[in-house]
A protein has these predicted regions:
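Lumenal/extracellular ectodomains and adaptor appendage modules
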Residues: 19-190
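Bacterial N-terminal signal peptides that target proteins for export
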Residues: 1-8
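Hydrophobic h-region of N-terminal signal peptides that target proteins for export
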Residues: 11-20
Length: 190
């Protein structure tokens, strides 16, 4: 990527970040489909993210795809963004994404993150940086059926239990979250 392209992408990102809620900018984070699989010691996330562009010309912007990092959530040991060149920096994968004029663009991401406690968190509060809600957010959260005391902080629309797994499903429209998706469980031995 040339210096000019980086500068232009950076300026566009700054312009998007500086927009007020009334004028959220030409890029809209429209939908996401998220599959979270939790087990003691690790969490895996597979997500597909869809955007619309209202601009008359192609827009390039730097996308920052964040991971929780704290005493429980280690740095991801695997990150995959198919078809994308990305850099890992701080607590995120960053890449340039091009949005076609008056069109849609999507990306898929997968990561595996080590856990050293009895909690797994998926960041959704970063949605607020887009300055308007996501039209539709769909989640599937799966844990081992024998994970003691497993709870989800969002109310599921439905639940499916098998001999080996418990899966929560929930969809939110006009999703503008004030808290991340969090799964907690008892740290006593299974």
């Amino acid at each position: 990527m040339t210096t000019t392209t980086r500068l232009a992408a950076g300026l566009i990102l700054l312009a998007l970040a500086a927009c007020r809620r009334e004028a959220a900018g030409p890029i809209h984070f429209a939908r996401e489909e998220i599959d979270i699989t939790v087990r003691p010691g690790a969490v895996e996330v597979l997500g597909t993210y869809h955007f619309t562009c209202s601009a008359e010309e192609t827009v390039a912007a730097i996308i920052s795809y964040p991971f929780p990092l704290d005493s429980v959530h280690g740095y991801p040991d695997s990150v995959v963004l198919p078809g994308r060149r990305f850099e890992l920096a701080d607590s995120a994968a960053r890449f340039v994404m091009r949005f076609p004029p008056r069109g849609e663009a999507s990306f898929t991401a997968w990561y595996r993150q080590p856990l050293s406690g009895s909690e797994a968190r998926y960041i959704v509060t970063s949605t607020r940086q887009w300055r308007r809600p996501i039209d539709r957010a769909q989640f599937r959260v799966t844990v081992p059926a024998d994970l003691p005391g497993a709870t989800l902080n969002y109310r599921p629309d439905s639940t499916r239990r098998t001999d080996s797994t418990l899966t929560w499903f929930f969809t939110r429209l006009r999703f503008y979250p004030s808290e991340d998706v969090i799964v907690r469980w008892s740290d006593r031995a299974r």
